[in-house]
Regions:
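Hydrophobic ligand-binding cavity/cleft-lining segments
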Residues: 1-55
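Intrinsic-disorder/low-complexity, polar/charged segments enriched in Ser/Thr/Lys/Arg/Asp/Glu/Gln
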Residues: 16-22, 64, 76, 89, ...
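Short beta-edge strand/loop motif at the mouth of beta-sheet-based domains
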Residues: 18, 38-77, 84-87
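A short, structured loop/turn motif at beta-sheet edges
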Residues: 24-28, 57, 83-87, 103-113
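Beta-strand elements of well-folded, non-transmembrane domains
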Residues: 25, 71-73, 120-122
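Hydrophobic pocket/interface hotspot
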Residues: 29-34, 40, 65-67, 81, ...
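Short, highly charged C-terminal tails/helix-capping segments
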Residues: 50, 150-157
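Beta-strand/loop substructures that line and gate deep hydrophobic ligand-binding cavities in soluble
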Residues: 93-146, 151
Length: 157
């Protein structure tokens, strides 16, 4: 599995990033992990997700969930699910209004293309400062690719 890589995708807008991978598993298996906040730390490629601290076991449209995080310093963040299409797409955002999305495209019964995207193109003020201060935009594409490789390992393992 160490030679497996996700594809970092070109993006058209500043403060956005995207990566894609093909996983040999049904979309439902992958989506179940994405919709479970308690599972997020298992496939986080950034090392910033510590654990889920509040929210439902399984996400749904409008659900809120809290995560313990660490980027330079420990903090907690509350996320809200803003898009949810079972086994196809899930998107959440938090106070700074950038979004994390996962889109799943089943290409065969046991083969799914997963695209992870980050969109901070519409943020301003403190949120822009935070992204610059943490270096997130420099690191996000690589971290997203690592997350997708970890997600693939879990789903195919």
């Amino acid at each position: 599995m160490s030679s497996v890589r996700a594809e970092i995708l070109p993006v058209d807008f500043p403060n956005t990033a995207a990566a894609r991978i093909t996983i040999d598993a049904p979309a439902s298996v992958i989506f179940d992990l994405l919709a479970s906040p308690a599972a997020h730390q298992r496939f986080d490629g950034s090392g910033s997700v510590r654990n889920a601290i509040s929210g439902p076991d399984r996400l749904f449209l409008g659900a809120t969930f809290g995560m313990a995080m660490k980027i330079k310093v420990p903090y907690r963040i509350k996320n809200t699910v803003v898009e949810f299409e079972e086994n196809k797409k899930i998107t959440w955002c938090h106070l700074m209004k950038w979004t994390w999305s996962y889109e799943l495209q089943a290409v065969a019964p046991n083969k799914t293309i997963v695209t992870e995207s980050f969109d901070a193109s519409k943020i301003s003020g403190f949120a822009k400062w935070w992204l610059n201060r943490t270096g997130a935009m420099d690191h996000n594409p690589k971290w997203m690719a690592k997350s997708l490789v970890a997600l693939k390992a879990i789903c195919e393992g």
